[in-house]
Amino acid sequence: MNTIEHRLMELEAKVAFQDETIDILNDEIKVHQQLLAKMKRQTELLAEKIKESQSSSSMMSNEPEPPPPHY
């Protein structure tokens, strides 16, 4: 086998390895994107619940809370 053929085989092997690595990384990115979307939705739901909780608690009593007993 001459040098050019050997170098060509090495390059083909490297390209094949890089293609496999790219496929693995793409799969990992998909998983992370799905997880990020899920976390974003959970954050939005929690923000909505906090707003609802704050608005319902402010509606329940318009008077300021009395100071704690130790004052």
Swiss-Prot record:
<protein>
    <recommendedName>
        <fullName>Protein SlyX homolog</fullName>
    </recommendedName>
</protein>
<comment type="similarity">
    <text>Belongs to the SlyX family.</text>
</comment>
<feature type="region of interest" description="Disordered">
    <location>
        <begin position="49"/>
        <end position="71"/>
    </location>
</feature>
<dbReference type="InterPro" id="IPR007236">
    <property type="entry name" value="SlyX"/>
</dbReference>
<dbReference type="Pfam" id="PF04102">
    <property type="entry name" value="SlyX"/>
</dbReference>
